[in-house]
């Protein structure tokens, strides 16, 4: 896991860590002893390791650069990362919460709530790289700069995968960026307005808020 930076949830040892409590306690203790923690988001297809919260400042310091990013991303790279996260993960999470897949025809499924949680390309759409460049390259720099300096760096770090002119979710995109912290800030913030202006409106609400409202309506 340390060498790969992430492992799929389907890996036998990852599956064991997620279901075997004794194994997980031992794993967490071993990671904690060296200042690390396992990052697990049930909606992400991969797990990862990261520095434990209490060692962030001793390791990185409280510099301005660390406050912006602890993986060495520039402001432009970080801005594009958030845009891509919003375009891929926000609709993906909505599909996951509603137990829908990209191939669904929109018809209601009476058994949808009992369906297993889907991951990967079943629920995560891909972005056209050409479309992304047309919409956002003018504000981030010229096309060559965005392709060579921004997208290439995000792909190198594992946040995205570039295949056949399309941008796909990388193994770290969903697991390292916290949906609960970011979703409302994007949906109700300036970025949501910017995305709408270029033809990529975000979902109207946080997917978890919609589910809570549905459950509340069912109780009454």
Model-predicted regions and their roles:
Residues 1-76:
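Eukaryotic partner-binding/assembly regions in large regulatory complexes
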Residues 2-18, 95-136:
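Short acidic, hydrophobic short linear motifs in intrinsically disordered regions
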Residues 21-27, 140-157:
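Short amphipathic alpha-helical interaction segments
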Residues 29, 64-71, 90-94, 137-138, ...:
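Long compositionally biased, domain-poor regions of proteins
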Residues 31-41, 155-168:
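A short, conserved structural fragment
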Residues 45-49, 166-174:
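Minor-groove-contacting beta-hairpin "wing" of winged helix-turn-helix DNA-binding domains
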Residues 46, 50-115:
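Short recognition helix of helix-turn-helix/winged-helix DNA-binding domains
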Residues 57-72, 175-220:
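Short, amphipathic alpha-helical interaction segments positioned at domain boundaries
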